[in-house]
Amino acid sequence: MAAPDNHRDATKNVHAGTNHVGDSVNTPIFLSSTYKLTEERYAGWAAGAQHTLLYSRLSSVNSDAVAQKICAMEGGEDAETFASGMAAISTTMLMLLNQGDHIVASADVYGGTYGLMTEELPRLGIETTMADIQDPSSYEAAIKENTKILYIETITNPNLKVCDIPAMVEVGKRHNLLVIVDNTFASPWACQPLSMGVDLVIHSTTKFLGGHSDLIGGAVVGSKELIAKIFKGRVHFGGSPDPHNCYMLERGMRTLHARMPILTSNSAELARRLLEHPKVVRVQHVTLPLSLIHISEPTRP
């Protein structure tokens, strides 16, 4: 599903995944719950092909187009899209973990993820230990014999702490664990964790990828093997995105490389001015000491 390697990132954002039906420049919105069961589609379904167009809970033209674009942006082998970021996270956890398994995650993890790990997964016999996102040694100290996943965020939501991804990957590889990163607050514009050895990248596409506060969505990117497992969960749990949201998301992703430099510049300037304001007690921003750590390798590819 990846776009040609000779395309620059901004070009991939615009062109990867677009389905030019009827010579259209953009992927049209396919408001169809069901597709005709041709012999070719039946053969694909019987062979277990993920992106066979039969029923929109399984796959749709619009969800496939968005998945291909996100896959190209993150440099993955395959991707799946979801109705929300939490649908992506919960489906991933439920398909990769079993009763008796253990996760190490950040104490600063997104609130919805924290609730999943501390309230819902324990009911299924899956335990989580919270560690310091800025201290890989605290993650390593929390690892148990039954640990299966190290879960991190590139930049924590909402406290904006920056994670040393290469160092976390080293910890994961030493213990033969999956390393999963929520890359929502960095976006592929700033960081492409798969290139650093991460196993799966998760997004709430509601945020920077969508970019206009008018959609809800999620995505997971990684190897074909892992995405195949997660796709099966999406089919069974029903967290598939609707075509209109996918169309809006595809539109938003085209302008990611145009939007992010302005967004990051403006937020840094706002943080600087607030820091100088006499009535402001504390400011959290990735350019300020509360967020920054030493990164062992550049996060911008």
PLM regions with names:
Residues 2-5, 10-19, 79-277, 284, ...:
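Conserved PLP-enzyme active-site core in the AAT-like
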Residues 2-60, 68:
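N-terminal "arm"/small-domain region of PLP-dependent enzymes with the aminotransferase-like
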Residues 24-25, 75, 242:
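Short, basic and Ser/Thr-rich N-terminal targeting/leader segments
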Residues 26, 280, 300:
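Active-site lining segments that contact anionic ligands and/or coordinate catalytic metals
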Residues 39-87, 112-120:
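Conserved N-terminal alpha-helix of the aminotransferase class I/II PLP-enzyme fold
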Residues 70, 289-292:
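Flexible glycine/acidic-rich beta-alpha junction loops that bind and position SAM and/or redox cofactors
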Residues 74, 153, 297:
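Acidic-residue sensor for enzyme active/binding pockets
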Residues 293-301:
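Single conserved hydrophobic/aromatic residue that forms the stacking wall/gate
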